[in-house]
Design a protein with these regions (language model features):
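Sec-dependent N-terminal signal peptides of Gram-positive bacterial secreted proteins and lipoproteins
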Residues: 3-23
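N-proximal helix/coil linker or "cap" segments that precede and/or mark the start of modular domains
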Residues: 20-42, 59-60, 116-117
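A short beta-strand-turn-helix
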Residues: 42-64
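Thiol/disulfide oxidoreductase modules built on the thioredoxin-like
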Residues: 120-125, 130-179
Length: 189
């Protein structure tokens, strides 16, 4: 009986292992999120001072880097010095045509007031917004932060990542890759 039970367990284990090996791979990279291809140019929200900001802001640059973050999020806080450095670099290099926008993830103590205080205390100067339903439909799909979307001047989301950037070089390479790709695409049309 013990031998039969052992053989039966071995067969079940082998069948389970084969089903795992032959399973179809997931269609998406786990670091990528849905939303690529969506047009977000119709958002209408406010900045942390209550001033209205619309999707027209996307017209200000060929590439807009939008980062979804919260004050309590460790990975968000870790990547912010890198974002600030890139914001300063691209602000002083207007021909690069890149802008940075933050969108706060409200809740768990992160409010417009606490976000504004955090940004000011740390010298972070890029535009930060509250999420409206349009931005939330892209950024709040997984419940994870930080998230980053790359948006073209036309308002179309080109990329959507979850997780933070761990170095300035990693962030610069990511931005340059997308900037180059969007420049090539613009020149082809």
């Amino acid at each position: 009986m013990k031998k039969l039970l052992s053989v039966l367990l071995a067969v079940i284990f082998a069948a389970c292992s084969l089903s795992l090996v032959s399973a179809e791979p997931k269609a998406t990279d786990p670091t990528r999120e849905p939303g690529v291809g969506m047009n977000v140019s119709n958002f209408n929200t406010v900045d942390l001072d209550g001033n209205t900001v619309t999707g027209d802001i996307l017209q200000n640059a060929d590439l807009t880097f939008i980062n979804y973050w919260a004050t309590w999020c460790g990975p968000c806080r870790s990547e912010m010095p890198h974002i600030q450095a890139m914001h300063e670099y691209y602000s002083s290099t207007p021909e690069a045509d890149v802008q940075f926008i933050g969108v706060i993830s409200e809740g768990n103590g992160c409010t417009p007031a606490t976000a504004k205080e955090f940004l000011q205390n740390n010298g972070y100067t890029w535009v930060n917004l509250r999420a409206d339903s349009v931005l939330r439909s892209v950024l709040n799909t997984s419940g994870y932060i930080p998230q980053t979307i790359i948006v073209g001047r036309d308002g179309v989301v080109r990329d959507h990542l979850i997780g933070g950037f761990t170095s300035q070089n990693e962030l610069r390479n990511f931005i340059e890759m997308w900037h180059d790709a969007m420049t090539i695409h613009a020149n082809e049309t």
